[in-house]
A protein has these predicted regions:
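Residues within the DNA-recognition helix of helix-turn-helix
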Residues: 4, 142-145
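Helix-turn-helix DNA-binding module
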Residues: 105, 109, 113, 121-138
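Arg/Lys-rich amphipathic alpha helix in sigma70-family domain 2
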Residues: 38, 52-71
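Structural recognition of an alpha-helix C-terminal capping motif at a helix-to-coil junction
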Residues: 10, 24-31, 44-56
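Sigma70-family region 2
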Residues: 30-45, 64-65
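Internal acidic/polar
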Residues: 68-92
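C-terminal edge and immediately downstream basic/flexible tail or linker adjoining helix-turn-helix-like DNA-binding
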Residues: 130-131, 147-162
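Amphipathic, Lys/Arg- and hydrophobic-enriched alpha-helical face
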Residues: 1-19, 36, 104
Length: 162
């Protein structure tokens, strides 16, 4: 529960735009899974199953509230250990982190979501494709778009790995 709660809450918040509602949705999903735990051995990939359940419940909640469904990642918690000892380097590190967060937030919504799921939540392309009902190729393309835009935004030329 605690391992996935933070990631699932951020994911649901991106859909419903309310942290409290997102926490309620995630809690409801976990309660539902607990109540139906005898079927857990039938689920092949539990983490993916939970993400899909959260997505479906969040969309259902929006429909109940007659709101337009948009997927957005506005609350990305980026944690960075301070690698620098002197205050000047710490300020520069903080400014760099802010620049990266701004660049991530300026990505197109789908590219931002794919980037978050792949890089922050460490999901595989196939899991992302299943979760978002898109092809693996679309996941690859969206991640490529995100990485190119981020590289341009932070001033690093984009180079493919050899």
């Amino acid at each position: 529960f605690m391992i996935l709660f933070h990631s699932l809450t951020r994911f649901a918040t991106g859909i419903v735009h309310s942290k409290e509602t997102a926490e309620e949705i995630v809690s409801d999903v976990f309660i539902s899974i607990w109540n139906d735990r005898v079927r857990l051995n039938e689920i092949e990939d539990l983490q993916l199953y939970i993400f899909i359940a959260v997505k479906n419940n969040a969309i259902r909640k929006l429909k109940q509230q007659n709101k337009r469904v948009t997927i957005s990642i506005d609350e990305i918690d980026v944690e960075m250990d301070s690698l620098y000892q002197n205050p000047e380097d710490q300020i520069m590190s903080s400014e760099s982190l802010h620049h990266i967060e701004t660049a991530i937030n300026s990505l197109p919504p789908r590219a931002r979501l794919v980037f978050k799921l792949a890089k922050e939540d460490k999901m595989r392309y196939k899991e992302i494709a299943t979760l978002l009902n898109i092809s693996v190729k679309t996941v690859d393309n969206q991640l490529s778009i995100a990485l190119k835009k981020l590289a341009q935004a932070v001033g690093t030329p984009f180079r493919k790995k050899s």
